[in-house]
A protein has these predicted regions:
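Secondary-structure transition motif
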Residues: 1-176
Length: 176
């Protein structure tokens, strides 16, 4: 999905609402000082309201972690080297030479980050409510291909559970 962000083919993502509300109906997103709450309600078996806090709000800036590797960039002279980073998502094959190996995204330091995202909009919906337009905004050709990856990442039963998800629209911005 990093490749889709780099190519500007992805500008939306979904994350499971945690914890999942026990109340089944969505009421509203409530803006508090520096956070958002999704309010859910139900009348059976008794009146109930569940408030769930969004992890991000519009204006938040996130940095994208990706598989990366240190590299040595040689200028005019071999002794005049500086160190930089290369990214597996660029599709180039870099050799594992002298200990320069691919490192998992979870170990990426912020200084190595090249992609920063600014949250533009937050909403929530049931997973299976995704539209074809939203699937394209997620970087997919269709809803079916979006669901296929969802099941691969979250398990076969996750699609049938049809959880509430946060929908985050974002834009790529220069390094802040």
């Amino acid at each position: 999905m990093v490749q889709a962000i780099v190519k500007r083919e992805k500008w939306q993502t979904r994350r499971v609402v945690k914890p999942q509300p026990k109340a089944e109906k969505f009421s509203a997103i409530v803006r508090c000082d520096d956070f958002l709450l999704a309010r859910f309600w139900s009348r059976r078996p008794y009146p109930r309201i569940d408030d769930v806090r969004a992890r991000f709000i519009p204006g938040d800036i996130l940095w994208v972690r990706e598989t990366w590797q240190h590299t040595k960039v040689l200028n005019l002279h071999p002794t005049d080297a500086n160190y930089g980073y290369v990214y597996r998502a660029d599709g180039r094959e870099w050799e594992d030479i002298e200990g320069w190996k691919w490192k998992p995204s979870i170990f990426m330091p912020k200084e190595a980050c090249r992609l920063f995202l600014k949250i533009k909009n937050v909403r929530n919906e049931r997973l299976q409510s995704i539209s074809e337009a939203d699937a394209r905004a997620e970087g997919f050709d269709s809803v079916d291909s979006c669901f296929a990856l969802w099941q691969k990442l979250n398990g076969i039963e996750s699609l049938a559970a049809n959880p509430w998800v946060w929908v985050y629209d974002f834009e790529v911005i220069p390094k802040p």
